[in-house]
């Protein structure tokens, strides 16, 4: 059976294409972010997995949760999550209503096909579609030591020039790399760490 990421791709593309055509890219990103957060919550996911609950009820519950706890910003925890995601709430009530109906139909389809568990992966793929449309890429950089401002700026400039896109760097530190960095952009990984070089040398010597 295909993995969740593979199964989620066509749903994410369909969602992004629809959102892009209807000028609701940010609104859909917000909806998918909240839905993914809910699916990742164990207590709520148990209810979503219950076959006795109808697809209509599940989709309505997810949209209602967004309506009451995010769009109205009544729930501070969800508001903080949305703000951290830099989501943009819809300003037009008419536009918001249209998006709500479309999202409800989308989630209902996933529920009927027993694929609500795909929502976190759908959200991640959706974000990638949006980034590509904006020519913006996420670069996940792991270094042996924290990068200095100069190192970060230089790396970002080089990646942007190489990829011909705006690059957002996400940093983490892993002392086991010994020195250097590893860079992951999409499915591509560049290992320029001392640990990686030592592993390559070991492989060559034992070949």
UniProtKB/Swiss-Prot annotation:
The gene is atpH. PANTHER family: ATP SYNTHASE DELTA CHAIN. It comes from Psychrobacter cryohalolentis (strain ATCC BAA-1226 / DSM 17306 / VKM B-2378 / K5). F(1)F(0) ATP synthase produces ATP from ADP in the presence of a proton or sodium gradient. F-type ATPases consist of two structural domains, F(1) containing the extramembraneous catalytic core and F(0) containing the membrane proton channel, linked together by a central stalk and a peripheral stalk. During catalysis, ATP synthesis in the catalytic domain of F(1) is coupled via a rotary mechanism of the central stalk subunits to proton translocation. This protein is part of the stalk that links CF(0) to CF(1). It either transmits conformational changes from CF(0) to CF(1) or is implicated in proton conduction. One of its GO terms (cellular component) is proton-transporting ATP synthase complex. This is ATP synthase subunit delta. InterPro entries: ATP_synth_OSCP/delta_N_sf, ATPase_OSCP/d_CS, ATPase_OSCP/dsu. One of its GO terms (molecular function) is proton-transporting ATP synthase activity, rotational mechanism. F-type ATPases have 2 components, F(1) - the catalytic core - and F(0) - the membrane proton channel. F(1) has five subunits: alpha(3), beta(3), gamma(1), delta(1), epsilon(1). F(0) has three main subunits: a(1), b(2) and c(10-14). The alpha and beta chains form an alternating ring which encloses part of the gamma chain. F(1) is attached to F(0) by a central stalk formed by the gamma and epsilon chains, while a peripheral stalk is formed by the delta and b chains. The keyword Transit peptide does not apply. It holds the Pfam family OSCP. Keywords: ATP synthesis, Cell inner membrane, Cell membrane, CF(1), Hydrogen ion transport, Ion transport, Membrane, Transport. Its main location: membrane. It is a peripheral membrane protein.
